[in-house]
């Protein structure tokens, strides 16, 4: 998938398409909470495999049972269709 920057109208519609994610100036972000560290780390491991498949890696942090993920396409300087795709796949994993 060749990434392209999302236009203003696409960004306005993005929240409805990827529930739970906040649209920021140059990235999208979401916080995920789990009952313990093992669940949080397991979630991160699943996401790592998706990101590797797309060759697109998030900025993220993990503190015990909390995972915060920030997605942007640094090469293009903002939020792209690839960020949207990965956010959607992350939501699918979280909801399982």
From Swiss-Prot:
BP-aspect Gene Ontology terms: tetrahydrobiopterin biosynthetic process
Enzymatic class: lyase
Record keywords: Lyase
Gene Ontology molecular-function annotations: 4-alpha-hydroxytetrahydrobiopterin dehydratase activity
Reactions accelerated catalytically: (4aS,6R)-4a-hydroxy-L-erythro-5,6,7,8-tetrahydrobiopterin = (6R)-L-erythro-6,7-dihydrobiopterin + H2O
EC annotation from Swiss-Prot or TrEMBL: 4.2.1.96
Membrane-traversing stretches: none
Protein family per UniProt: Belongs to the pterin-4-alpha-carbinolamine dehydratase family.
Protein name: Putative pterin-4-alpha-carbinolamine dehydratase
Organism: Prochlorococcus marinus subsp. pastoris (strain CCMP1986 / NIES-2087 / MED4)
Source organism phylogeny: Bacteria, Bacillati, Cyanobacteriota, Cyanophyceae, Synechococcales
């Amino acid at each position: 998938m060749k990434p392209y920057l999302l236009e203003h109208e696409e960004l306005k519609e993005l929240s409805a398409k990827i529930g739970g994610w906040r649209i920021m100036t140059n990235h999208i972000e979401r916080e995920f909470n789990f009952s313990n560290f093992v669940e949080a780390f397991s979630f991160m491991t699943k996401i790592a495999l998706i990101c590797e498949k797309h060759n697109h890696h998030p900025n993220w942090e993990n503190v015990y049972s909390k995972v915060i993920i920030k997605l942007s396409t640094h090469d293009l300087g903002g939020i792209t269709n690839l960020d949207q795709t990965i956010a959607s796949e992350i939501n699918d994993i979280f909801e399982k």
